[in-house]
Amino acid sequence: MTQQSPAFIGPAWLEREQLIDAPDPVMLDWLFNQDSLTRRLDRLSDGRFSVFPQFEGWQPLRPDECLALGLPEAGEGWVREVYLRGNGNNWVFARSVAARSALQDGGLDMDELGTRSLGELLFSDPAFVRGTLEVCHYPEAWLPAADAARGLWARRSRFDRDALSVLVAEVFLPALCTAIHDKDHV
C-alpha cells in the first residue's frame, strides 16, 4: 500500500487541451490512447504480459479520488494496487478505486480479480463507459518505494456502469518508456 500525506490534496490532473508542458509525441500517444492499456502492453511484450498485485483492501480514499468519484472527503473504497508487467519488468503501477457503497451494489467483484487485469474486465463489458483521460506527474510519495521517482507521467479515467464508478490511475514507469523506445527503433 502506498503512503499518503493528509495535508496533500493531490496533483493537478489535466486533460490533453490543458497541458502546457506536454511529453514527447510517443508518450503523449500512450497517455491519451483510448484503447485498453492491457492489450497494448500485451502486444508490446509479445504476449509476455502479467499482473502482479501489491495491495487490495478497504481504506479511506485520497481527496483527489473522492473528488473524481463524487464522494465526500475521506470516503471509503476498495483499493487495488498492481504492477502491470511486460517481459518480467514492472512497466506500469496501477491504482484502481471504487466507493464501498457503489461496489457493493454494482456487481463488480474487484476483490476476486487476483492476477487478472481489471482493464480487460472493464473493456470486455460494453455497459462500462470510459470518461475523460487526465494526466499528471504522479506524486513520488504515492509510488511503491522500489519505483519512487519524481516526474513520472500518469493517466487516469473513470469507468461508469449505472451507479458504479471505478477510477483507474496508471503510472508509466521507466522500464515501459525503454520498452516503447526499443520497439520503435527495431
From Swiss-Prot:
Q: Does the record carry Cytoplasm as a key word?
A: yes
One GO cellular component term? cytosol
Q: What is its main location?
A: cytoplasm
Q: Which reaction does it catalyse?
A: chorismate = 4-hydroxybenzoate + pyruvate
This entry's Enzyme Commission designation comes to 4.1.3.40
Task: List the GO molecular function terms.
Answer: chorismate lyase activity
Listed GO biological process terms = pyruvate biosynthetic process; ubiquinone biosynthetic process
* Highest taxon of the lineage: Bacteria
Residues that coordinate or bind substrate: R80, L118, E170
| Pathway stated in the Swiss-Prot or TrEMBL entry | Cofactor biosynthesis; ubiquinone biosynthesis
Q: What compartments host this protein?
A: Cytoplasm
Q: Which UniProt keywords apply?
A: Cytoplasm, Lyase, Pyruvate, Ubiquinone biosynthesis
Per the record's keyword annotation, is Lyase included, yes or no? yes
Q: Which Pfam families does the UniProt entry name for this protein? A: Chor_lyase (PF04345)
EC main class here is lyase
Give the record's family classification.
Answer: Belongs to the UbiC family.
Its job:
Removes the pyruvyl group from chorismate, with concomitant aromatization of the ring, to provide 4-hydroxybenzoate (4HB) for the ubiquinone pathway.
Report the protein name in the record. Answer: Probable chorismate pyruvate-lyase
Q: What is the lineage of its organism?
A: Bacteria, Pseudomonadati, Pseudomonadota, Gammaproteobacteria, Pseudomonadales
